[in-house]
């Protein structure tokens, strides 16, 4: 979010990190629910707009530690009276979150992880080390920015560099031979140009060719086997006088 101070081209910025996949939570009436929980900052729904169906406005709601927003899918399980109620982490009974609102479900055709529960980022210190203000070693976060319409991402590069040299120990890193830089990647190119996806495409393609080759070889072996069997049958018939 600091990027907005250095880059006026940025309309909104957010970051989030995983809390727990398949998080088991216990309601006040001892029901157990399960969902993917992520720690999100207060600008999360500015970058990824979702209609807030019930509850507090996220700009204030996600600023308060232990507040959380649940998906409409979970609302169907918990009921409309869940606002303001506490949910307890089954594994850590001393950790509680309060339902501050309900957001519209994210569509299935998104590269974002499945988010059922958005927990206010200030909660992080109760679960793990609070490195929100660290400029180095924060690779656990996913960061996104929304640019003003018509903005060329390349125009942000000088200001991003200035931001890094102002806040991070860049000279010290360079002296040690390390590199640290930030670049912007359009969301709509992630699926098409991700190195991981390219590798996986090659792996699946190779696997498909192997399966096809095995199927062809099996067919050839079956044909050869049937021909040999047929030849043996003919030889047997001739031994007994068949023409």
Q: What function would you assign to each model-found segment?
A:
Residues 38-57, 67-196:
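Mid-to-C-terminal secondary-structure elements
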Residues 1-54:
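Short amphipathic beta-strand/extended segments in non-transmembrane regions
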Residues 64, 141, 178, 218, ...:
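Exposed loop/turn and edge beta-strand positions of beta-sandwich/beta-sheet ligand-binding modules
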Residues 194-211:
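N-terminal membrane-entry
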Residues 31-32, 198-200, 230-231, 243:
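Membrane-helix interface segments
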Residues 3, 74, 99, 159-163, ...:
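Structural preference for long, well-ordered alpha-helical segments in enzyme cores
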Residues 217-243:
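Intracellular coupling helices
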Residues 17, 57-65:
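Short linear loop/turn motifs
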């Amino acid at each position: 979010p600091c990027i907005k101070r250095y880059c006026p081209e940025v309309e909104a910025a957010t970051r989030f990190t995983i809390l727990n996949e398949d998080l088991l939570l216990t309601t006040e009436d001892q029901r157990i629910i399960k969902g993917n929980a992520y720690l999100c900052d207060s600008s999360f729904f500015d970058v990824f707009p979702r209609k807030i169906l019930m509850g507090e406005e996220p700009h204030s709601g996600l600023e308060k530690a232990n507040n959380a927003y649940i998906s409409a899918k979970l609302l169907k399980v918990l009921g409309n009276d869940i606002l303001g109620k506490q949910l307890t982490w089954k594994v850590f009974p001393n950790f509680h979150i309060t339902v501050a609102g309900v957001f519209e479900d994210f569509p299935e055709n998104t590269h974002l992880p499945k988010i059922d529960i958005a927990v206010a980022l200030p909660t992080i210190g109760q679960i793990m080390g609070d490195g929100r203000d660290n400029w180095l070693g924060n690779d656990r976060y996913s960061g996104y920015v929304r640019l003003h319409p018509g903005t060329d991402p390349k125009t942000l590069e000088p200001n991003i560099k200035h931001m890094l040299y102002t806040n991070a120990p860049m000279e010290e890193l360079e002296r040690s031979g390390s590199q640290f830089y930030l670049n912007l990647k359009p969301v709509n190119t992630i699926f098409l140009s991700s190195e991981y996806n390219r590798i996986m495409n090659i792996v699946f393609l190779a696997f498909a060719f192997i399966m096809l080759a095995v199927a062809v070889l099996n067919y050839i072996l079956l044909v050869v086997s049937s021909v040999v069997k047929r030849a043996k049958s003919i030889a047997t018939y001739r031994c007994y006088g068949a023409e």
